């Protein structure tokens, strides 16, 4: 089945990016997730930000549209701005915090890091990219396998 995801990239005044630590996996992600039926990508990004962080946000611009070679999935990434709410633990994320772009945790999937870099590098027009990185779960499993071998 084909799925569509939507993520939001939020920078604070110091240029740090907001990441959320997932409850189900030991990963830091950008706020975002799957779109609901009848929902626009912008609406999904705003909803996911609220559900995962407790923050109210507005969309500023489209960063990129990403396909995945091994999955029937399309992902939208936007930058946004916080207009209200406050960071809270949620059902989906046990912690959200801002990180300097050069200090993003090692357990952040490469595809999320790539989207952050795209937000910084391609400020005038969106990027359209096929992301070849492993899925978050596959990537985490590969890290665990490497750890078991050492």
How should each PLM-predicted stretch be described?
Residues 16-17, 85-88:
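Short helix-loop capping/hinge motifs at secondary-structure junctions, enriched
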Residues 26-27, 92-150:
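Nudix hydrolase/Nudix homology domain
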Residues 33, 47, 60, 99-102:
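Structural detector for helix-capping/boundary residues
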């Amino acid at each position: 089945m084909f799925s569509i995801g939507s993520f939001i990239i939020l920078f604070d005044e110091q240029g740090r990016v907001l990441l959320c630590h997932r409850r189900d996996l030991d990963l830091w992600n950008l706020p975002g997730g799957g779109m609901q039926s009848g929902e626009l990508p912008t609406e999904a990004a705003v909803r996911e930000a609220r559900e995962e962080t407790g923050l109210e946000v507005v969309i500023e611009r489209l960063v990129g549209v990403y396909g995945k070679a091994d999955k029937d999935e399309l992902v939208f990434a936007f930058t946004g701005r916080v207009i209200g709410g406050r960071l809270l633990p949620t059902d989906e994320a046990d912690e959200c915090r801002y990180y300097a772009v050069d200090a993003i945790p090692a357990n952040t999937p490469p595809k999320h890091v790539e989207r952050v870099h795209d937000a910084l590098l391609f400020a005038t027009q969106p990027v359209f990219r096929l992301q070849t990185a492993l899925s978050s779960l596959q990537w985490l499993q590969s890290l665990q396998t490497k750890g078991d071998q050492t």
